UniProtKB/Swiss-Prot annotation:
Its EC number is 6.2.1.45. Activates ubiquitin by first adenylating its C-terminal glycine residue with ATP, and thereafter linking this residue to the side chain of a cysteine residue in E1, yielding a ubiquitin-E1 thioester and free AMP. The Y chromosome form could be involved in the survival and proliferation of differentiating spermatogonia. It holds the Pfam family UBA_E1_SCCH. The gene is UBE1Y. It comes from Osphranter rufus (Red kangaroo). Keywords: ATP-binding, Ligase, Nucleotide-binding, Ubl conjugation pathway. The keyword Ubl conjugation does not apply. One of its GO terms (molecular function) is ubiquitin activating enzyme activity. Gene3D superfamilies: NAD(P)-binding Rossmann-like Domain, Ubiquitin-activating enzyme E1, SCCH domain. This is Ubiquitin-activating enzyme E1 Y. GO terms for cellular component: cytoplasm; nucleus. PROSITE patterns: UBIQUITIN_ACTIVAT_2. Monomer. It comes from the Eukaryota.
């Protein structure tokens, strides 16, 4: 490793850090005192960092994981939550016991599915699909190109 060799050569410490989704890691390397950076090996990645999926997918696995996550968040999870809401009288009570912002997110998604974005006919479904496509494949791409111009 280039940086590792130069840190040893110039006797300078190296602070290496990284993230993987919600996890983070840090390694302090002090020449001739601690293990060198290149002698350690990262464990195999189990998941793809969300920043990679959202902003910089660069492998087919990233595309597949993004598509799977997108499908589940659009068609699987909301449908399961709506079905639970309609059939289980204790759904709201159980949902309110979830941690953090989850109760709000789940209940807002149920409200969105049953009230705000409920389609009444086929034309509503087509309109929703067109708007979603435009958001994902036009607006988001334009925003990424604005935030990270290709010439950088």
């Amino acid at each position: 490793m280039y940086m590792d060799r130069h840190c040893v050569y110039y006797r300078k410490p190296l602070l290496e850090s990284g993230t993987l989704g919600t996890k983070g890691n840090i390694q302090v390397v002090i020449p001739f005192l601690t293990e060198s950076y290149s002698s350690s090996q990262d464990p195999p990645e189990k998941s793809i960092p969300i920043c990679t999926l959202k902003n910089f997918p660069n492998a087919i696995e990233h595309t597949l994981q993004w598509a799977r996550d997108e499908f589940e968040s659009l068609f699987k999870q909301p449908a399961e939550n709506v079905n639970q809401y309609l059939t289980n009288p204790k759904f709201v009570e159980r949902t309110l016991r979830l941690g953090g912002t989850q109760p709000l997110e789940v209940l807002e998604a149920v409200h969105r599915s049953l009230v705000l974005q409920r389609p009444h006919d086929w034309a509503d479904c087509v309109t929703w699909a067109c708007l979603h496509w435009h958001s994902q494949y036009a607006n988001n791409i334009r925003q990424l190109l604005h935030n990270f111009p290709p010439e950088q």
